[in-house]
């Protein structure tokens, strides 16, 4: 069970994810430089971490989506293996065409760093099988471009295909655009591809993986991945 | 060009003539003009800075390096420093603030440390003016824009409004980094026969003469100064951090230096002088952003995101490869030689040939005359008009907690990534910010404090109280202090009354540091913060750093539990002069703040640290701005529960609840711990003042304040 964490120029959560996977969750993880063309032997999970790849110049994630390593990541995804994009990594996945939609500037037009309540919409994915459906969890967000957008018809398809995994929510469990701090359509915070093996989300599970940092709701994501890779549940 | 136009005084020019034995050429004159400016030479402040105690058991590297380093335990060091970027932020708020953050991060990097957190000190003018709105928005976005991208969390700071900052807003940027004690970089280790390598951005015409610009008063037309402000690129800075740390990890560099004020000249001559080597630089080899730059422009450009590396010949190839890996320009621009000569060449011609030690170390000190301000007695005469205030405390509390300097600052802190690097245990919004060190399990506690109102009434007492007030939050959280860094923001030293205030404030700081054994490990001075005769109040800003050992957990505020007993520790006779209450309600500062009380501070320290270590309290907060009333209000809001307070007062209730100063704190103690808590505080003034519970804050002889109303006032909702 090995994870590879891709490091783009400007990634700044790569070390955080390596810490959460390796030290906290016990999933051996290694950094992979974006100029590499193949993933390390035995990679089962690829994580595209948060940060400001290429300084967010041009468009968030646009240049990183054209990095040499992305070919190998795409190949990995097409084989049905796991890819997780967090924050800037989610933006890269949409730019690479591995996930639908686009992340636009927050409706506040400001950077927002804040803890957020999320409602878990699906528990039958490799990333969320340790959660209870409808559970409220707290992950922080920290981004300027996190407004999830899709044209209406595609958005409807996304919902019909049950591709929404996390939605911004309030304490009473309601979720939607009104609960989303950044104006995301339908309150969407994280989605999977049709096959369910590629997850992108704006909130940071790696920042919610230790009690000393204020919460451990993110731990269940790592545990979900672990048990899925160990063949425990699908 | 004559020496005056270069910004030199005649006495200084005479020294240059004497030392060189000839007249300097134009390039040399410009170099001296910048390097001997106030900003680079500290010529006005050096005599005062000598007052600071710099030694301490846990100081690994002190003043004289880019940043001080203290021992964080188990072979790890913490490098930290605070620096101003006031003038640039007044002219171009976004870039001025952004490059302030970038500059201090490189100072920390230059010590070989990975930058792990920032704090920002923000001082703005009239909160309702269009100018303040523009400046504060730009500065906050600049701090966030740079810090967020570069991946260094902004975990706290200080924000204060006063009309005297209207034309001269202050931005003080603090950064702290982690370094293995054995890998600290010193600028004294260059050897002859090494390559001088420039890594990072190309050099352009931005920021030329920035240091000199920061050494005079701001002009009224700030737009005219725009060319002196640098433009930042946090993306390149992030690459630079990773590249430099990778080079250090692989032992590829002998030493390195960040490029800030006075660019290549400053960084290169500093290494040469401190290491006792000479240097020849070929300016033709500097990667340029624009063509036909002349020698002095290249030598003095303050283009951002550049580092100077000194590399042994056998490591050069690996360093160049590293530059390529990180897509950074990386060029050999010269070599180190035996001797003391600092030579700049371009196109085969020598443009400067100076003794390296003269450039950075030759500027004579200036001892400005100091004069006690004529109106000081008048400032210090205090007549507290108690008759103007009813005994009700609720209304003044609701007004004060909604005042610009005390109200919630979420509009600022939400724009900062305070959590990246996953170390933030206590982020913005508390008197102390806390980080964990993954490498050794210890916790670092950091505070930032500045008390311009108290300092303008009595700069000595103000300086002392500023220092003590920066330490108290550390102690209350359970941390033992390791050291402090300071940024001395003052107006022109050429005005004798202003210089007197500067001197007194520094003496106050220094005496407190000595009394409490807190070494000063780094710092920065920013003078000439005035525009057209309008001066900022004396604003010495202090950041203190302490450590909580791995086995202990921090005692934090915002955690009142139902049934907790509230204790006020410390004297009740604090002071209204210089307080938020006086500034906000009386509009006029007057009177004398409290005199220092070293024994009280030491006694407080010992007991506070013990209280945290024994986990005797659920929640604790030192009394800071707004005194007891604001501490109660904030604790109540943050904990989401009310309290009933009963307290007899010998004087007017307002004086008890809103006075400031002195070693005081508010503790919430569960019933089972009350006996041990009181034993711990034996020998120190302590008084039980209330009980936690209910959904309102009930102050004596006052209407209860429902929590929701209190929180809305604070949040400005």
PLM feature spans:
Chain B
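Glycine-/charge-enriched secondary-structure boundary and capping motifs
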Residues: 1-6, 10, 16-29, 167-169, ...
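Glycine-rich phosphate/pyrophosphate-binding loop regions near the starts of catalytic domains
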Residues: 30-239, 245-248, 254, 269-273, ...
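Catalytic nucleotidyltransferase
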Residues: 233, 593-599
